[in-house]
Design a protein with these regions (language model features):
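Solvent-exposed beta-strand/loop surfaces of large extracellular or lumenal domains
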Residues: 66-79, 337, 601-621, 725-755
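Catalytic and substrate-binding clefts that recognize carbohydrates or anionic sugar/phosphate headgroups
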Residues: 84-222, 231-232, 244-249, 552, ...
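C-terminal low-complexity, glycine/proline- and small-hydrophobic-enriched intrinsically disordered tails
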Residues: 630-877
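Catalytic core of carbohydrate-active enzymes
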Residues: 421-429, 443-444, 451-461, 468-694, ...
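Aromatic- and carboxylate-enriched substrate-binding clefts and catalytic-loop regions
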Residues: 253-517, 552-554, 562
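Short, well-ordered beta-strand segments enriched in hydrophobic/aromatic residues
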Residues: 44, 52-54, 91-98, 573-576, ...
Length: 878
């Protein structure tokens, strides 16, 4: 309804158009003071101390219009010195020295060089140098890709960063944009247009400066970080409702509903389709509702919105507007098509065509209730009317800016493939139809993080994969679960299996791992405040939420070698488990590198892992490993959040042990375009000493529409011993096992004091102090969380195993003395170390028990118990 009202207002005040798209304060023409002319044929523009535009023109005419990539060259002019003679020009900034020998031939290794430092060593670049050390960027699509085996059609493209310290962006043949931000051809002449990024290993700085000239990566609406449900399958509106209802009935949240192409008439599309005059399968393009499945689209959208969902429809627009489409007459009238009865070719790069397309074809569907579009362009890469213009890029540009201009009250976004440099301005990304293999799962973290090298930070993958090789395969519960666990730490959380009866993603079809899947969904929703923080940082700095380790550790070789690992925001080291568990123990083992500079807290096991080491670590299917920097503070949602339509009133602050730390927590309204200026920041700090922990929440700074004056808190202090008392703003609050607001409790399974506070004024300082008993250390609790959670998960299988032989006998006393430790702590939290000491004393006894004669359990289950309970703990203590 909100979007409908916005649309009606626009229609009353303006004629529909997409040419008025804007990029804020972007000014394509550089400040004259940044420009250096060198003879009659060369021009250099000093954009930053390490970024220089280098142009050579045969006729001495240079280009000041925006290109598809570079839209803003009017930056603050850096300090630089120019030395000119009739034969040579030298430009020296604080970081680089450019030398050009004046002449009438294009740039080459003899007449141009740029000197700078990389990791303290002198680097010299000249034209034609090998760029094999480039750290790469991304590609248009992962269609048909198995693992890292890119197709020849869509190879991984070069990025803006290199181990050699430089990267060249050749903008020579890129299309331009006119004063209305519409596509314009470059003059055909002898001309070179290069940008050198000479940042050495200052990778984050290079990306920040890239956004100055190419535009920021917009902040998507908060709701887009929830679960996207999608399947290429023929569904009716009532079937879609049933699926959403069933997902929610088993406690799986959903925020985005994607309706694939069967929403429209497919005109008899089958496995041997008839082709139209454009070489496309008849029925692949469509704009006419398939009324047998969707008899009342407005009612379907009303239900979806009432259910808190955003919706999208799939588009394959390559076949233009066909005479059999319901919108044909309306489009022809708006466009002025003078060949009635003949199809109108797709021509998105013609302004008149694009305007008519939106007004006559798409906007009526939006008025029915559709929220955004999935642009599933898979056809010819370049325009038939502007050779060299990427259809993917221009579709994204037009659709995004149309939404931005015509729905000013809402934050625009679409779902699409990568169209080349500059595509970061149009979130979000669809990575395509991948092959379902363990190798594809393993590659997606690397691919996603590497895409940060061109600031493309919002890839959405088909979690679980899209299709089997040759459409022949069998779903695997463990693999799908591991994919969902990885997806928690990816930009978008989406499934999308292909149209095949063997490709199904209904969680209830995987009972053996259903609970682990549900836990992954819940963790994703808990992580959204942290994710949204990282998304804002992408907007501010140009660093995507998933980025390679070498951004932070550029001189460490492991940062380039461990490609399955990546940073998820600034405080979380993430990975994926892309191997099946051992057939006997169920444990999957991965190699991990923990960067130097701080320790890392394993959120799965509770172990504190020293930085500067590699480890071989085993995890069960119940474990989803992620590692937080010691001392960090992770903002989270409480465990009950199942929708992102509105922000939760309760903020969970998870304080990680091992060091002091801080957090800047970002908030805005989550939906509008006003986030550039209307937002708040809340600064949080934790300070730890031997016998106390102090968490300080400073008054909120800033404002945005609809913000509240108070909030509730759930403050969790991971792996911290039971306090002797807890003070809130200097006043002691009581302990309660089942705590309410104004009380604290002890979460024994996480070994964490938890403080609950309600209606805390956000404009006042909040101080929470844990006074800890002397004589013992929190480090004695490290790695116990893993034992507790594994015992909790394996106790029932243990009972079942033993019950096959004797259903009346108790579990072994050696096991119970270990597994029941958290229950003892919950009953008597002040006696925590008594029970922890008992566990540590009894663990060797349990190991001896497993080594002896145990007729009630099989050798295989003994091995499983040992691997889960004993070996994992011993490994984490190293």
């Amino acid at each position: 309804m909100k979007r409908l009202l916005s649309t009606l207002i626009v229609l009353l005040v303006a004629v529909l158009g997409v040419s008025a798209a804007s990029f804020g304060s972007a000014v394509p023409r550089a400040n004259d003071k940044a420009v250096v002319l060198a003879g009659s044929n060369a021009r250099f523009t000093v954009l930053t101390p390490q970024l220089i535009r280098m142009e050579w023109s045969e006729d001495g005419v240079f280009e000041d219009r925006a290109s598809l990539t570079f839209i803003n060259r009017n930056l603050d002019v850096p300090q630089f010195k120019v030395t000119k003679t009739s034969k040579k020009v030298v430009i020296k900034t604080s970081d680089v020295t450019l030398t050009y020998h004046v002449g009438n031939v294009p740039f080459n290794e003899s007449n141009l060089k740029v000197e700078f430092l990389t990791a303290g060593q002198k680097t010299v670049w000249t034209p034609g140098m090998d760029d094999s050390a480039n750290l790469m960027g991304t590609t248009r699509t992962l269609d048909n890709v198995d693992g890292s085996k890119h197709t020849a059609k869509d190879p991984l493209e070069k990025g803006l960063l290199s181990r050699d310290g430089w990267a060249i962006v050749d903008d020579t043949n890129k299309y331009l944009m006119d004063e209305n931000w519409w596509v314009a051809p470059r003059p055909q002449k002898g001309y070179v247009d290069w940008y050198i990024f000479a940042y050495g290993h200052q990778y984050k700085k290079a990306l920040a400066d890239y956004t100055k000239v190419s535009g920021k990566a917009p902040l998507p609406p908060r709701q887009t970080f929830g679960y996207w449900w999608s399947r290429y399958w023929q569904y009716s509106d009532s079937e879609l409702k049933d699926i959403i209802d069933r997902l929610r009935s088993i406690d799986i949240p959903v925020d985005i509903l994607i309706i694939d192409m069967d929403w429209h008439e497919t005109w008899g599309l089958d496995k041997d389709p008839e082709l139209d005059e454009y070489g496309q399968r008849i029925g692949w393009t469509g704009y006419t509702w398939q009324k047998e499945l969707f008899p009342a689209p407005e009612q379907m959208f009303t239900w979806a919105h009432d259910a808190g969902l955003k919706t999208a429809l799939n588009l394959h627009p390559a076949s233009g507007i066909q005479p059999y489409e319901e919108c044909y007459d309306r489009f022809c009238k708006e466009y002025g098509w003078d060949q009635p009865g003949k199809s109108v070719p797709f021509k998105i790069d013609e302004k008149k065509w694009a305007d008519a397309y939106y007004k006559a074809v798409l906007q009526p569907i939006e008025l029915q209730g559709n929220d955004f579009w999935w642009l599933d362009w898979q056809q010819w890469k370049e325009s038939k009317y502007n050779p060299g213009l990427s259809n993917t890029f221009w579709l994204n540009h037009v659709f995004y800016n149309y939404a931005k201009e015509n729905y000013p009250g809402l934050r625009p976004f679409l779902y699409h493939r990568w169209g080349g440099l500059g595509s970061h301005r149009y979130p979000l990304g669809f990575s395509g139809d991948t092959i379902i293999t363990w190798e594809s799962l393993e590659y997606q973290p690397e691919f996603t993080a590497t895409s940060a090298n061109v600031n493309y930070g919002y890839w959405g993958h088909d979690l679980g994969g899209h299709m089997f090789h040759g459409h022949k395969g069998v779903e695997n519960a463990e693999r799908y679960t591991r994919w969902l666990q990885y997806g928690v730490f990816s930009p978008l959380y989406k499934i999308h299996p292909t149209k095949h009866p063997d490709c199904k993603r209904y969680p209830w079809l995987f009972p053996e791992t259903l609970f682990q899947m549900i836990e992954a969904f819940h963790l994703r929703y808990a992580m959204v405040p942290y994710i949204y923080n990282a998304a804002r940082k992408n907007y501010d700095t140009g660093v995507a939420m998933c980025y390679p380790l070498y951004y932070d550790y550029p001189e460490t070789e492991e940062a380039y070698q461990y490609k399955r690992q990546f940073m998820f925001g600034d405080d979380i080291l993430a990975t994926c488990i892309a191997v099946p568990g051992d057939e006997v123990t169920g444990v999957a083992t991965i190699d991990m590198w923990f960067p130097e500079g701080n320790d890392w807290f394993d959120m799965a096991s509770g172990a504190m892992l020293k930085g500067g080491q590699t480890r071989n670590i085993g995890y069960t299917i119940d474990d989803n490993p992620w590692y937080t920097k010691a001392g960090s503070i992770i903002p989270m949602n409480p465990s009950h959040v199942r929708s992102l339509k509105t922000a939760c009133d309760t903020l969970v602050l998870t304080a990680i042990p091992g060091a002091d730390g801080h957090l800047s927590y970002y908030e805005d309204d989550g939906v509008s375009q006003n986030y550039d200026k209307e937002y708040t920041i809340t600064k949080v700090a934790q300070k730890r000493s031997e016998n106390n922990v102090v968490l300080t929440v400073s008054p909120r700074e800033g404002q945005y529409a609809g913000m509240k004056d108070t909030r509730s808190y759930e403050l969790r202090f991971m792996c911290t011993r039971t306090p002797s008392k807890v003070l809130v703003n200097g006043v002691e609050i009581p302990y309660a096992r089942y705590a309410k607001s104004g009380q604290w409790t002890y979460d024994a399974y996480n070994l964490a004091p938890v403080v609950y506070l309600k209606d805390v004024p956000v404009n006042e300082t909040l101080t929470v102090e844990l006074v800890l008993p002397e004589g013992r250390s929190d480090s004695e609790l490290y790695a116990l969380k893993g034992i507790f959670s594994r015992c909790k998960n394996i106790s029932e299988p243990y009972k079942n195993e033993q019950g096959l032989r004797d259903r009346r006998i108790m579990l072994s006393i050696e096991y119970l003395k270990v597994s029941q430790c958290p229950n003892f702590i919950m009953a008597d939290p002040q006696g925590i170390f008594k029970y922890v000491d008992d566990l540590k004393a009894n663990l060797p006894e349990f190991e001896k028990y497993l080594q002896g004669e145990t007729p009630l359990i099989s050798d295989g289950f003994k091995a499983r118990l040992k691997a889960h309970v004993v070996d994992g703990y011993k490994e984490n203590l190293k």
